[in-house]
Amino acid sequence: MTRVLSVASECAPLVKTGGLADVVGALPGAMAALGDELRTLVPGYATMPVVGGAVVAAFDDLFGGPATVDALTHEGLDLLILRAPHLFDRPGGLYIDAFGADWPDNAERFAALSYAAAHVAAKGAGDWRADVVHGHDWQAGLVPEYLAGLGCDTPFILTIHNVAFHGNTGAEKLDALRLDPDRFNADQYEFWGQISALKAGLMGAAQITTVSQTYAEELMTPQFGMGMDGVLRHRRDALTGIVNGIDLDVWNPETDPQITPYTTFKGKAANKAALQAEFGLSKAPGPLCVLVSRLTDQKGIDLLLDAMHVVLERGGQVAVLGSGAPDLEVCLLERADAEPNLAVKIGYDEALSHRMMAGGDCILVPSRFEPCGLTQLYGLRYGTLPLVALTGGLADTVINASPAALARRVATGIQFSPITAEALANAFSRLCDLYADRKTWTAMVRNAMKQPVGWDMSASRYHALYKATARK
């Protein structure tokens, strides 16, 4: 058994803004099945639906005010909640204020999370002591710096969910963040004259993981490394990719309370009809394509706007759920007003996302980059074939309907490359051809629903990594 302190800025079902929370929330259960014991340290945000707990650490002054770490159990998760009201008990989002601007003290807020994690690793939480610390993204990146300051040799593993966010702040905050100025150099946490929490984590980690093997390789290139490609090439021997899994109990077409449950391809028909009615779409001869996404250029929404005429002209439909860039929201809504087979709902609705997975024929993920992606895994589970860009985890989890894959009866979706509107338009054309061939389409849906999209394989790899890395 390896005892692991997992450190993250969010964790489902407590608090969530994206897929990071789902992974952090699912990992403890997956690892428990293999005998490992995870406790998850997260900030105590104002919106968090848990109170109380046993105090296992206390700070008189944690970057501007008193704080405690409280141990409790919630929905099967062993949690350590960092209660620091001056940093986390405020209205607005986890990372941004009510006006969409980053909180000006984000550096201090997540330095506090890392500092508390190092303290728990060094001093323990009651009679519990971690063998390894597993941090997620830049918000946990300063953990190895604080471990070094405490003289603690507990190994640190960093998982990169999205390298686009570095957690950089000005060098004038060295003292305020209680960092060793002698380590402010290119070999530690200095990055172009700034303090970089992500670089600190990358340089201080015993092992680095990211959420797919293709993304691990992409990260070492200037195109995808977001400025950290040189650091990652330097640490390439410590870098590996482990694809995320999904919660097979939450995402289960046989038991999902949000849908008409089904076990085979034929069961999707009732859900498709219900989804068309919910979106105000009539019955159509072509495939119903669904998109559940943030509406940003990174997610390829501009490409969709330029290419979806192909599927609409061939009798298909597109249903969109998401929010994001105002200009893209407006473009989609205006197109929907003019296109009877395009329907758009701005916002996010978890229950509706389940109904879209059950009722769609195809799930669209045209992202310009996608470290892992969970949406395509939900689609596979529900027999909603993914149409995806050839990047990151999308490349690793979808078997393209190439002639060879179709001949071998292993195809589970459609990939397109390069990531352009023209290539996406061609992919829509291929989609319509495949959908018209009912025998081939049915075989692909059956293949998709048999794919191992849970945590078993990924958990086995983390189990081996924890065991190899843990303090002996």
UniProtKB/Swiss-Prot annotation:
Coiled coil: none annotated. One of its GO terms (molecular function) is alpha-1,4-glucan glucosyltransferase (UDP-glucose donor) activity. Pathway: Glycan biosynthesis; glycogen biosynthesis. ADP-alpha-D-glucose binds at K16. It is an enzyme of class 2 (transferase). Its EC number is 2.4.1.21. GO terms for biological process: glycogen biosynthetic process. The keyword Ribosomal protein does not apply. It catalyses: [(1->4)-alpha-D-glucosyl](n) + ADP-alpha-D-glucose = [(1->4)-alpha-D-glucosyl](n+1) + ADP + H(+). Keywords: Glycogen biosynthesis, Glycosyltransferase, Transferase. The keyword Nucleotide-binding does not apply. CDD domains: GT5_Glycogen_synthase_DULL1-like. Synthesizes alpha-1,4-glucan chains using ADP-glucose. Belongs to the glycosyltransferase 1 family. Bacterial/plant glycogen synthase subfamily. This is Glycogen synthase. The lineage of its organism: Bacteria, Pseudomonadati, Pseudomonadota, Alphaproteobacteria, Rhodobacterales. The gene is glgA.
